[in-house]
């Protein structure tokens, strides 16, 4: 069976990313004891599940798991290190995001839970987001010109529409 001529493999990866995110958010919401290692365990489970159920390679599933961990880690770091809300990290109104995704994230993103999940010993330099990777919802800022790219669902990171740079970051803490 051949794939349709309009088939976009990044659409499949975006869909798989969202499936993985839903699994992790659902697991966090249901858990009574939330820990950093538990998040990694949920991401690993989601990686195996999406590799089995969707038409993506194990290599792509591993990349998606890495990108999902990066996105969750960035959100957790931002909310726990600032006085700002998750909507500030996103960089736009949450009304633009599918309700199921934002509800799952907000239900698990209370400050107490996030504080428990934040592991200071694993502090890191800010993540660099590159063209061609998949990212979840939120705002990326071009490292070259400061242009903001808004993602209202998981999607492939394009080059900057203003300067064509391929390196981005999320809103950073002070």
Where are these regions (language model features)?
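Cys/His-clustered metal-coordination modules, chiefly Zn-binding fingers
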Residues: 102-174
């Amino acid at each position: 069976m051949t794939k349709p001529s309009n088939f976009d493999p990044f659409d499949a990866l975006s869909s798989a990313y969202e499936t993985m995110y839903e699994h992790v958010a659902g697991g966090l919401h249901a858990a009574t004891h939330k820990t950093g290692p538990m998040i990694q365990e949920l991401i690993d489970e989601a990686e195996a599940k999406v590799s089995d159920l969707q038409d993506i390679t194990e290599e792509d599933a591993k990349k998606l798991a890495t990108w999902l961990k990066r996105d969750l880690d960035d959100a957790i770091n931002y909310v726990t290190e600032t006085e700002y809300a998750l909507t500030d990290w996103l960089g736009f109104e949450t009304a633009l995001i599918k309700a199921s995704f934002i509800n799952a994230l907000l239900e698990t993103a209370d400050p107490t839970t996030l504080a428990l999940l934040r592991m200071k010993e694993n502090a890191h330099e800010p993540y660099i987001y590159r063209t061609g990777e998949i990212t979840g919802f939120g705002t990326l800022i071009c490292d070259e010109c400061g242009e903001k790219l808004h993602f209202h669902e998981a999607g492939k990171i394009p080059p900057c529409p203003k300067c064509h740079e391929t390196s981005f970051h999320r809103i950073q803490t002070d």
